[in-house]
Amino acid sequence: MNKLFVSLACALSLGYLATAAPMKTTLASYNQGINIIPQPKELVQGKGSFALTAKTPLLAQGDSAYIIARFFAEKLQRSTGYQLPVRSSSSAQPGAIYLRIDPSLQLGHEGYQLKSSPRGVEVVGRTGAGLYYGMQTLLQLLPAEVESPSLVKMARWNIPAVTIEDEPRFEYRGALVDVCRHFLTVEDMKQHIDLLSMFKINRLHWHLTEDQGWRIEIKKYPRLTSVGSKRIEGDGKEYGGYYTQEQIKEIVKYASDRFVTIVPEIELPGHAMGAIASYPELTCFPYRRVYQVRNIWGVEQDVFCAGKESTFQFIQDVLDEVVPLFPGQYFHIGGDECPKIRWKECPNCQKRIKDEGLKDEHELQSYVIRRAEKMLAKYGKKLIGWDEILEGGLAPTATVMSWQGEKGGIQAANMGHDVIMTPGSGGLYIDHYQGDSKIEPVAICCYSTLEKVYSYNPIPEAIVPDKRHHIKGAQANLWAEYLYTTPLMQYRAFPREIALAEAVWTPLEKKNYKDFERRLDNAYVRLDQHKVNYHIPLPEQPLPGSRQSASLSYVAFTDTTSLTLQTTRPIRIVYTTDGSEPTAKSQTYTQPLHISKSQVVKVASVLPSGKLSRVRAITFDKQSLSPAVELATPTPGLRTKTSVGNYYSAADFASATNWTEGVVKTTQELRPDRLNNHMDEIKRKAVVGEGYIKIPADGSYVFSTNLDQMYLDGELFIDNSGETSKFSRHDKSRALKAGWHRVKFVFVGAVRGGFPTYWEDTKVEYRKLEDAKFSTVTAEMLAY
């Protein structure tokens, strides 16, 4: 590395925390050491530190460096209170922070050097982006409170002496936000961009059109927003939102100022119901049904008609308005999950296949993609599509975004096409669970831990060595089906997006997950300054003799039991047994707790900053065995009654009188119909099944179900009413004698949170408290 300073002297002085007047000088543990994320390519720590004071000038060489200097001076003023002078200068000066751009720097496009000593700091970027990232690194050398939007009383604002040479491993470091399933405001978008740029993520993939909503103004087609941006939810309420073109420009500029390039996505030829509901003539059969913006998740069978030339004129018109709003090189056209059933029926599509000499509907999709590619080429844009664009042949210059595992990315790279890796199997679908589904907010499925995201390597061994340069990077996808609020979106995104940032920036040999966990403690405090609702691992209960969690908030026992806790990564657990709320100073959990009486144990995880996770209250109820009843002549199954009506939850049919009686063999049959992914098939009804369940032996039993309600021995036992009950989060236990026990089960056919209950598996599962495995309640266990 070039030497920017001759001497690095004096003793290292770290930041001290003072959160309130009078100023404290207590050393904050999370501010100890070097806490840069992502870990730089090369870092050498020197002796001493540079003290940032109100008199520290920011000197900049050249106009671009001056703009960046002003940006960071304003940011530093908010937390330090210092009005740091910003001046143009052709050379460094003692006591200053000097910024410059040097295109001859022997680093990649976004590379930078940073050197600090007690005499001063110099940050050199090969480009403006490199200089910006160097200054983000400088902020991470300061105490975490530097991210505060308001004045913080600190004993010292010190920058440790370091020599850093850094550049990213990959050029594409991305994060996807889905504003179609659930909308993000302009301010939400700006905050997310701020957070991405802090950790050197340089691409924001903006998913703007979907079956569930069209979110961008198109002046030539006003119904796309007056109709296509709105849907009627399962509870009858309207949900909507869209961005005007002026708002798009505002967000794009905001991102550009922070060196984040926005990649827009306009979905075609599938995922198009937002457009089709607005203009039905875009589909193969405009008069077959009443088209509405989809209010359930999943994929619509109706897609853009590939046989009509008017469809391509619509696509051209949309691109003519959208492309100029986004100056980046990439434009995403989707291309995924496009059902071919309508094309097979459509005479226009079949004529297109014949006229163009195409083999089948897969090649018809490829035809659509190639035409979109040519439209984008007029603007000098590179087309990106999901890996389904490989079907039927790949457009010549297309970049593949590989999401269905790595197979598509491997195939495309070995063919010589550029690839962006984003496989769910690699942990990069960060809308997936990151903890026990029994206690975490509902998610679509699956399990993506922080360590799994961090450990992902975007270059699979199956790519031949001379084709590996085609892997341009990786992206974390934040699909929003179950992200009902902005805080919930943040909870899914962070800290996993931070793990992705290091996975795609830091050289493979420099990655160290344990050290990343240490540095993350500092990053958490930075997120706190931005009021981010990030995920803190919750205390979970493992199944007996297992590491698999199946947490339980109501534990019935007859003699004694125990409470064993674990977290998805090392973090201190605190608890109380007197009913009080835990604090950072509460008793630390070190070993299983012995429980011999009825009580409530409250548990939480606590970070080094003192911040607590959500508190879990676990009720322990010492019970006598609930007696069984005698059935003289049990008849297999459950008696049912069914009522059709505008029902949303169990409370809605309390006064219903239009019941039809029947019998079912299992609880699975309480769901009378199976929805085949079409919102028009949804039937609003309630089904109640009553009878008895046979318990095989005395003991405490845990029950789990996604049904709306389960009554046991005449009492409401499990209540999922009104929830998106995709994965049971209300498991409960009861001490039961062997034999028959009265039960009632309630199923309500409705759409809640975009999830139709007709997609539920309405089985009931049970296990003994001491067992590690659930079993399904079978027909042999039910009678009336």
List where the protein language model places each region.
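Active-site neighborhood of glycoside hydrolase catalytic domains
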Residues: 295, 299-397, 403-411
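Feature activates predominantly on carbohydrate-active enzymes
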Residues: 105-330, 371, 375, 475-479
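Short, compositionally stereotyped local motifs that mark structural "simplifiers"
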Residues: 20-24, 59, 511, 517-642, ...
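Flexible, acidic glycine-rich loops studded with aromatic residues
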Residues: 383-388, 393-398, 404-553, 558
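Contiguous, structured surface segment used for ligand recognition
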Residues: 21-170, 488, 504-526, 530
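Coil residues (strongly favoring Ser/Thr
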Residues: 7, 64, 79, 376, ...
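Bacterial Sec-dependent N-terminal signal peptides
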Residues: 1-29
